[in-house]
Structures are given as C-alpha cells and as structure tokens.
C-alpha cells in the first residue's frame, strides 16, 4: 500500500521533506535571534550594574572623607581630655602620698594590736584544749552510761515479760476461785466478750480496707500533684520565652544605639583631620594614624602608672581587711568558749537537781513497798486456809524482792538523768483489776468506731478532692492541647517568619561586610587584602537563597507535571471509553520536546486480538499525513475507508468512526 504514489499513507513525501528543512532552518534562525537578544539584554544589565557600582563607590569615598574630618575633631577632643586626666592624675598622686603615710601609721597600730591579740589567742587556745579534753571525758562517760542504759532496758523488758506471765497465772487462779460462785455471770460475760471480740475483728477488717482505699487515693493525689507541677513548669517555660523575646527586643535597641555611637565616632574622626587642600587623602590618613598611635602609647603609660598606684592602695586595704577578720575571728572564738562554759554549768546544775529528785522518788517507792508488805501480811493472817492466796502472796513477795534488787542496781549503774526515766518505767506496773478485760474491750470498740467514722469522712473528702482535681486536670490538658495546636499552626510553614530570617541573615552579612570594608580603608591595607572575606560570605548567602528558590520552583514544576500527567491520563481514559480510541502522544523526530505534533490512535476493539500490538494509526499534524501500521487486512480496510470519507468527502471524524464500526463488526460480533 505504501508503494503507490497516490496513496495518502506515504511515509515522507518529497514536498514534506522540503517543508521540514525550511522549518528547521527557521527554527535555528529564531533560536539565534533569541540568543542575540538575550546577550544584548545581559550586556545592558552589566553596563547598568557597572554604573551603579561606580556611583556607590563615589558616594562611599565622599562619606569616608567626611568620617576622616570627624575623626580629626575627635582626636583634638581626646588631646584635651588627656591633659585633664594628667592633671587629675597628679592630684591623685599627691592625695595617695598623704593616704599612704596615714595608712603606715595605722599599720603600726594594727601590728601592735595584732601582737596583743595573738597572745590572747594563745591563752584562749590553751583553755580551749583543756575544754576539749574535758569534753572528750564527758563523751566517754556518756557512752558508758548509754551502754548501761541499753542493758537495763533489756533487763526491764525481760522483767515485764515475766510480770505479764505472772499476771496471767494470777488471773487463772482468780477465775478458778470465783468459778463456783459466779458461773452464770461468767457465762454471760464470756458471751459478751466473744461478741465484742467478733465486732472488734470486723471493725479491724473494715479499718484495714479503708486504710487501703486511703493509700490508693493518696497515691492518686500524688500523681495529680506531679501533673500539676509539670503544668507549672510548662507555664514557667512560656513566661521565660516571653522574657527572652523582651530581651531580644532590648538587644536590638542596644545594637541600634551602638551603631549610632559608631557613626558619631567616625564623624568625630573626620572632624579632627585638618582640611588642607594641598595634602592627599593618603597623607591625611597616615598623619591621623600616627597621632592615634602616639596617643595610644601615652595612654598606656599613664594607665600603667595609675594601675600601680591602685594596686598599692588595694594591697593596703586587703592587709587591713585581713587583720580585721583575724580580730573578729578571735572575738567569736572567745564568745563561743564562754557560751560552752555557761551551757556546761547549767547542765551540771540540772544533773544535781535530777539526782535529788531521784533520791526522793526512791524513798517514796521503798515506803510504798513496805506498806504493800504489811497489807500482804494482814491478808495472809486472815486467809491461812486458802492455798491459792498463799501462793499469790509468795509470788508478790518474790516480785517485790526482785524490784528492790533492780532498783539498787539502777542506782549504782545509771546516770542521774537516765535513772529518773528508768525508775518511772519500773514503778508503772499493771494493776490487777477483776473487771479490767471487759472495760478494755469496750474502750477498744468505741475507739475503733470513732476511727472508722473519721476514716469514712476523710475518704469522702479525698474522693471529692480527687473529682475536682481530675476535672481541673482535664481542663488544663485540653487547654495545653489547644495551645500546642495553635503553636504548631503558627510555626508550620510560616512564610513571614522565613522571610524575616532571610532578611536578618542578609542584614547581618551586609553589616559585617561594611565593617570589614571600613577597617580595610582605615588601616590602609594593600590591594591584595582589600577584598574582605565577608563579601564572599554574602555572595555565598545570595547563591544559597537563589538555590533555595530554584529548588522550590523545581519542586513546584515536578508537582505540576505530576498533576498534568494524572489529569491527561484521566482525559485519555474518558476519550477511550466514549470515543473508542486510546490516544498516545509521540515525540516528533525533529524536536523531542514537541509532544503534540504526532498522535497514535489504537481502536478499543482491537485489544482482544493478537494483531493489536501492530495495528494502529499515526496522525502527523505538522506534515498533515496519516499512516497505518498493521496487517494487510487492516491496511486495505483503511484504504477503502480513506477513499470514501477523506478523498471524496474530506471527513476524518467519519473515517475514524467508520473504521471503529468495521473493526467491531469484524472482530467483536
């Protein structure tokens, strides 16, 4: 089909080749013209940049000349101040000479006083050593008494245990004696005691349960308090951030003030330089620097002299302060020793008083023991026939004898202060009461009921506090979450803050560059060192900013390409669904970036056949040609339809729809 000359499916006719060559030449000419115009614009921009740089440097030279004049005026002012400082220095030297003489007299007095205080200190030190020895002896005695006290406490506990066992045996004997006469009463009392014991056990259980609840509530309360503390720390951090912002504003204001001072300083330097038209700028600057160096040397010499005098005065003052400190330390030591002496005398008086009281208590206890013995003798005479009472009395007599021996040993071993406490603990013996058990149970029950009520009230209060604190915690947590969300929204992709950061960086770099340029101009550096590093840093920063912009634009372009490809896929799928052809844009052989000149059309109804891989149409918009690729049947079918619809009627859409219908009739139905 491609061999026939009149066929519309020729790959590349001769007229089309001529048109392609003309198109390529025109495209080359347009590209060259565009490059020439871009070079011209770049040349004009470079010329404008050159002119602006020349104007800037001329303005900078004018400003620097003005600054040199102000510096000259400042140096005149500095010379005047130097003369005034010289006169002040002479006056201060005279005053310092007089003060040195007076200080020497004071030093002699202080040395004499120091010798006297040294002697007193040695005397007090010897006394202090004596007191330390006495104190060590007292400590050793105290340790001995403490050890003896511990031994006596152990003996007392053993005696108390024996006393309890004896009381139990005594109670058993009394119960055996009264069992015959009071059986009914004892039965009722036993029942009552059992009931009380059961109630006591129940109350103890409830008490334990309530105690566990209280512990859990206290733990919850501690956790709530910890969360509250965390909240307080977060609020403190927020306040500190606000303070830091205020500090930052203050520092910016101080920076502006310093820059103003810097400008005024340069103006004074310019004023100080004489305006001679005959001299050049370099000679003026050299003269200015020489004067400045001379003034620096003079200032250094005067500063050294002044520092020497100041150090001498400071040394004298430090010696005086050291002497005063030593004197105050000696006085404080004397006062502390007097206080220790007074406290020890008071302690000795107390010990003597306690000794007298202990002697009186011992006599009282002996009298009470004698009375008890007499009562026991009377009872033994009245109840000679009762064996149990005799045993009871013998046991009591043994107990009294043991107590008597214990009291004698305590008198010998215990110190005066510790005897009183031990005698009091030994004298408090448990009384033998018949109805004591019932009273003890009743009192325990009443106490436990009161404690139960108190614990219930505390539990209710703690539960209420827990609820209120939980609500407050929830409110605080919700507020914190809202604040965090707001803070994140404020920080996330904030272009204003980013722009401010970039501006601040450029401002800092420009100010640094300006300072270094001024330094190079003032110090009169060589041409090799005229270009500072800050200029390179500023250019690098500009490059980085441009690179970030380029990266952002590239990201945006890639995002738009993805969106475009996705949308084009959607459109092509819609076209293939409703019009019956899948469309694919092919790059042109002349320009690979041109994707709209050649279109590949594949019928939707050819997808189920093996021929679908090679049966398709290519429509070239620029060359206005149509090419069929596939089998002979497909090409003949296309030829018939082309003669009918394109050559005769010039209707390409009808040709495409007729081709689709014929493919459907042939392959699908």
UniProtKB/Swiss-Prot annotation:
Function: Central component of the spindle assembly checkpoint.
UniProt keyword terms in alphabetical order: Cell cycle, Cell division, Coiled coil, Mitosis, Nucleus
Protein name, UniProt field: Spindle assembly checkpoint component MAD1
Protein location: Nucleus
Any one of the GO BP annotations: mitotic spindle assembly checkpoint signaling
Taxon lineage: Eukaryota, Fungi, Dikarya, Ascomycota, Saccharomycotina
Coiled-coil ranges (or none): 24-225, 302-487, 533-573
Organism of provenance: Debaryomyces hansenii (strain ATCC 36239 / CBS 767 / BCRC 21394 / JCM 1990 / NBRC 0083 / IGC 2968) (Yeast)
Chain ranges passing through the membrane: none
InterPro entries the record matches: Mad1
GO cellular component: kinetochore; mitotic spindle; nuclear envelope
Family affiliation: Belongs to the MAD1 family.
Origin superkingdom: Eukaryota
Main location per the UniProt record: nucleus
Entries under Pfam families matching the protein: MAD (PF05557)
